A protein has these predicted regions:
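Surface-exposed loop-to-helix/strand elements on domain peripheries
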Residues: 233-252, 274-384
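Structured, contiguous alpha/beta core segments that scaffold functional sites
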Residues: 2-296, 302, 306, 313, ...
Length: 410
């Protein structure tokens, strides 16, 4: 017998079981597994048979992406929280900034459960994860008292003629209700916000769905890393059956029983370092990983960059190593706001203005970009340009900076 590893004593009785398993069968078995070039191996590498991708369903994507993938979770949280943190400015029909206490109160507390910032964060997150967000208004038409977010996978759009849905079906457990849509005005108690989808007239395409393959690759690389850690960062090897006499290969039942014994006694982190004692006819062939097999880290980082790209987030903001596309963190945050956060915040504000603005006497809603610290470099550039323009009047300068005119000025 030969000791192949150092560590604690072998499990009692294993050698006897191995002897019984490798003893030639008394009754020949008609079907046996053919011996390979090295004899009978309990482990073998095979080429990939085909990739398996996560199903494109909301619950599956949300679980595999937002719940289980740290890059997706960080990207969604970063964008949605940034969108929710920007306050809104209400304007009347002439473009003047106005304050409407009833609307301000609704936005500050849309419903008894949620405050305004958390509500807008969840809404933005649903758009990123599902490509759709459904807001139900409770109260008088056009002037709601409460706003509630409905889970996207529980709402079904009832298709109608002319691109206008006939209603929205909301299913929660056994309860099903239909929220109708006015066929003439298109108004409904449901405000449906959706992103562009080239293949669907009624639903949006989420960033999460676009990143699904990169998410699967990132998760698979993480699982591969975990499997290596569980097996001492290398495949243990192959146990080869090479008898001096008797059948050249184990029978099927002998093979399966021996494989089960090895798995129970030696596989996994809990058995790391356990010695393997071999009887006659058995030989241990240690295996190693090639540099390409070990290069899962590069593949995982590449997948993380693709995920960040799908969500419009600079990779360095989600912790991807060696992804310093921007000179510093401030420039990366500026790009995040200009390319992703501000456009999404503007789209949400415009949708709310169309749905609820008329009932409160509001002509338009827009994010107050002066309250965003990350955009300070752009504000400084604009102020410097306006100040340097000597041919502008005082009110023209104020208009260029987003302020209303002074009454005493022409």
């Amino acid at each position: 017998m030969t000791e192949r590893k150092n560590g604690p004593a072998p499990a009692p009785g294993l050698i006897a079981r191995l002897r019984r398993l490798v003893r030639p069968a008394e009754i020949p078995v008609p079907e046996t597994r053919a011996a390979g070039p090295l004899g009978r191996a309990l482990m073998a590498w095979s080429p990939p048979q085909g990739a398996r991708w996560t199903a494109r369903r909301y619950a599956t994507l949300a679980d595999e992406g937002y719940v289980r993938n740290v890059v997706v979770h960080r990207a969604v949280a970063l964008v949605s929280r940034s969108v929710a943190a920007i306050p809104w400015i209400a304007r009347d029909g002439e473009g003047r900034e106005v304050s409407v206490p009833a609307f301000d109160a609704l936005m500050a507390r849309p419903n008894p459960r949620d405050e305004g910032t958390a509500f807008r964060e969840a809404l933005a997150a649903q758009l990123l994860i599902a490509g759709n967000a459904y807001v139900e208004a409770v109260g008088p038409p056009g002037r709601p008292r409460e706003l509630h977010l409905l889970r996207p996978d529980r709402v079904t759009v009832q298709a109608g003629p002319g691109g206008v849905p006939t209603g929205y079906e909301h299913r929660e457990g056994e309860q099903v209700r239909l929220i109708p849509v006015d066929p003439l005005s298109g108004r409904s108690a449901i405000l449906h916000l959706k992103t562009f989808h080239p293949l669907d007239d009624w639903h949006g395409l989420s960033s999460l769905e676009a990143a699904a393959q990169a998410i699967d690759q990132h998760n698979a690389a993480g699982a591969w890393n975990k499997a290596l850690l569980d097996n001492a960062a290398r495949p243990s090897g192959a146990l080869v059956y090479q008898p001096k006499d008797g059948p050249a290969a184990l029978a099927d039942d002998q093979f399966e029983r021996l494989k089960a014994e090895i798995a129970e006694q030696f596989e996994g982190a809990r058995n790391a370092g356990r010695p393997l004692l071999l009887d006659g006819g058995l030989d241990w062939k240690p295996l190693s990983l090639s540099p390409a097999d070990m290069d899962w880290i590069a593949g995982r980082n590449a997948a993380a960059r693709e995920i960040a790209l799908a969500f419009g987030v600079p990779p360095q903001l989600v912790g991807v190593p060696d992804a310093q596309t921007y000179a510093n963190y401030a420039e990366a945050r500026l790009a995040l706001y200009e390319d992703t956060v501000v456009p999404l915040a503007q789209a949400i504000a415009r949708a709310f203005a169309r749905a609820y603005g008329p009932g409160f006497g509001i002509a338009g809603l827009e994010p107050d970009l002066d309250e965003v610290p990350a955009l300070e470099p752009r504000r400084a550039e604009r102020w410097a340009k306006v100040a340097a323009a000597q041919d502008l009047t005082r009110n023209e300068r104020r208009a260029a900076l987003g302020y209303g005119p002074l009454p005493e000025e022409n």
